[in-house]
Regions:
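Outer-envelope beta-barrel architecture signal
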Residues: 27-29, 54-56, 65-67, 93-95, ...
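C-terminal beta-signal and adjacent terminal beta-strands/loops
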Residues: 81, 101-151
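Transmembrane beta-barrel architecture of outer membranes
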Residues: 14-16, 51-57, 92-96, 132, ...
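Membrane-embedded beta-strand positions of outer-membrane beta-barrel proteins
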Residues: 33, 60, 69-71, 97-99, ...
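Short, surface-exposed loop/helix-turn segments at secondary-structure junctions
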Residues: 83-89
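Gram-negative outer-membrane beta-barrel transporters
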Residues: 2-82
Length: 151
């Protein structure tokens, strides 16, 4: 069976905060702390659906000549402040790595070759904001090799 939903407008209050701070550790090394959280309630009582879970992370980045790299840990909290017809979503942590090399064609056009590895812990994770979260979880361990050319 398909779920049938009917939406109507209602007054609601959203409160939240997001931020990030970056500290340069050396000429070629930096660290970034980031996070966000939001709460939403209907003014007449009740919770709103598909509100994202609280998220926090740390990223270490480095660069040397034309090379760049980063390692990142993102922690997403369990979302159990749910509307009547929703289910809670478990929290998860994700480890991501990336490295890239930047160059330029003789014409001056920039290019980049990159390698990204995401969700290296291969955690089963769900996006609470998705209508199909239980049918389509976030991608498991994955590696991407790509080329970018700006034109």
């Amino acid at each position: 069976g398909l779920q049938l939903l009917q939406y109507s407008q209602a007054d609601a209050t959203f409160t939240g905060i997001e931020g990030q701070v970056r500290q340069r550790l050396t000429r070629n090394l930096g660290i970034t702390l980031f996070g966000d959280t939001v709460r939403a309630k209907l003014n007449g009582g009740g919770l709103l659906p598909r509100i994202p879970a609280t998220r926090a992370g740390v990223r270490l980045d480095a660069n040397w000549q034309a090379w760049e790299g980063q390692v990142e840990w993102v922690q997403v909290a369990r979302q159990n402040r749910v509307a009547d017809f929703e289910t809670a979503t478990p929290g998860y942590g994700m480890l991501n790595l990336g490295v890239s090399y930047n160059g330029q064609f003789s014409s001056g056009t920039p290019w980049q070759v990159y390698l990204k590895a995401n969700n290296l812990t291969d955690r089963l994770a769900y996006a609470h904001t998705s209508f199909i979260k239980t049918a389509a979880p976030l991608m498991g361990r994955n590696i991407t090799l790509g080329v970018k050319v700006a034109f």
